[in-house]
Amino acid sequence: MFDLSNKTVFITGIGSGIGLATAQVALKIGATVYGTVFSEEQSETITGYIPSECIYKVDVKNSDEITFAVDDAAKCSGKLDGIVAVAGILSLQEFTKTDDAIWHNVIDTNLSGSFYSARAAIPHLQKQAAASIVFVSSQIGLVGHPLGAAYAASKAGINGLTKSTAVELAPNSIRVNAVAPGPVVSDMTAKARADEKRYNSLLADIPMGRFGQPEEIATIINFLLSEASSFITGQVIVADGGFTAH
């Protein structure tokens, strides 16, 4: 198993799903973890895993809030070795019914929030001999999906952000990668899983015949944070049970 001993990692969206699983795996392999939630209720839920002083209630659409949280975490820990931008939202509706408010909320949360998080972290990451940024994309950022224009655009944007930033930061020994999950068992997919017809339709498109588990995606993310992936940068790693392979 790869190791994050003596590493400090900041993770957005640790209140549930992939973010929570990423924090749990990171803690298990030795990391000190700081992270963001969007509600007090989420904060209370995860205090059993992470001390309350390491949890920040943040709106990732607000660059000032995320910058303060990252700076404060780096100050408290004395350093920052990696950041993972997980926080995101899913909104599905017809293209012509995607109004300005929906569009901006999805783009600002998923894409701008990821950008703000990385931008806040880079000055701290540059102080380390080696550091890592991991974004969370989606298979929907790689293939078409009906009703998902805003979400697909936000995730495709993350793919471009990953590659451009990786090339720019490579001379600073900062690696930048993304993970693109397929459907995962989480709050985000709860509605789809509750609809038997829709759920079975989704399963039919996944050669492995199941949704992924948050821990499976979290393991890939932590691999990318670790020195076990020291020659990997600029990659969008797809974990979708074979969906995009056919």
Where are these regions (language model features)?
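Active-site helix of classical SDR
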Residues: 118, 154, 162
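Conserved glycine-rich cofactor-binding loop
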Residues: 15-17
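Short, small/polar-rich loop/turn modules that mediate ligand/substrate recognition or access, typified
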Residues: 84, 170, 175, 232-234
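Residue(s) in the substrate-gating loop at a strand-loop-helix junction
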Residues: 138
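Alpha-helical segment proximal to the catalytic Tyr-Lys
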Residues: 123, 167-171, 230
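Substrate-binding pocket helix/loop in short-chain dehydrogenase/reductase
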Residues: 94-95, 99-107, 202
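Short C-terminal tail/terminal secondary-structure segment
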Residues: 143, 222, 233-246
